[in-house]
Amino acid sequence: MVMFATGLLATQAVAQSARVVNVYNWSDYIDPKVIEDFTSETGIKVQYDTFDANETLETKLLAGKSGYDVVVPTAYFLERQVKAGVFQKLDKSKLKNLGNVWPDIAKRLAVYDPGNQYAVNYMWGTTGIGYNVKAMRERLGPTGTIDSWDIVFKPENLAKFRDCGVHMLDSADDIVPAALHFLGLNPNSNDPKDLEKAAELLEKIRPSVRKFHSSEYLNALAAGEICLVVGWSGDIKQSQKRALEAKNGVEIDYSIPKEGAQMFFDNLSIPKDASHVDEAHAFVDYLLRPEVAAKNSNLVAYANGNLASQKFIDKAVLDDKGIYPDAATMDRLYTVSARDQKSQRFVNRLWTKIKTGR
């Protein structure tokens, strides 16, 4: 009996000493080796789950007791969530690598998180057009190019790609602002009349869109199952890389339209009710190491907010203007702010109608 009790106490002690961090991140958004190396170095086990829509993350956060210690919200959702009180302030004394952040990116992020108190940038990117080069040339001619939103938002143009498969992000917060911008309206407009104009435009092109999804297009584009997508820069670049690795003859390219596109920021935050706060800070700090940030960018093909990492980033990635846009392109990028709840509900209803036709 004494031996059993002693064994039980020992088991409990081991369980209590086991360290873990529960992470909720976007799909295809980290080098798995980074997780392995973090655990090997720190002894902290990483429980890693993924999502492919900000709404999924937000639902869990607002409900409380999400069970996660580190999450990765996009900035315009972060802004609203900070106001809702779902995050705790970062303990910057535990983030020794915070000095590696890119000041310009931190400044842009501060628009959503004043003082950068609740988040630090993980990755950033753009929302543009990914396409199959062969399919594009077959439809637009040997000298054809995709460099304008005209190809998406003019129904007669998008219809040319209907037969080979068009996908679009299932994200009203990406697609509606793009439609507003194309119409010459403020991409951040909450005016119902503006939003209805954007919805009318999207309803006109809806017949040519095979599917709305925020992650399936990565593999579908690489496999040649679809030929055009409005998607996120890094995902399309990953698709390009996978097609090359598969040697399947599919050539993928990515365009940031000349009219401009959305620039987004995905960020590391710690929920207020996180159970493993020290481990969460340790994980965030590890991701802020220059060589670690570079390893992630090299694999996922997204730019990161870590200036010190650039000397470790593959030249092909750093020189790719679809990943790290040049200054002229950066000047044409716009950002999206959080909508108030009433406007967000209105946009969500419009989005459902656009997708379903009802």
Specify the residue positions occupied by each region the protein language model found.
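Hinge/lid segment of periplasmic solute-binding proteins
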Residues: 17, 79-126, 145, 150-153
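Short beta-strand->loop
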Residues: 88-99, 150, 246-262, 271-274
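Mature extracytoplasmic/periplasmic domains
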Residues: 266, 271-332
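Ligand-binding pocket segment of bilobal, Venus flytrap-like solute-binding proteins
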Residues: 160, 167-255
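Ligand-binding "clamshell"
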Residues: 82-90, 107-109, 114-116, 208, ...
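Sec/Tat signal peptide C-region and signal peptidase I cleavage site
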Residues: 9-15
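Conserved C-terminal helix/tail region of periplasmic/extracytoplasmic solute-binding proteins
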Residues: 219, 327-358
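Early extracytoplasmic/lumenal segment of secretory-pathway proteins
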Residues: 16-81
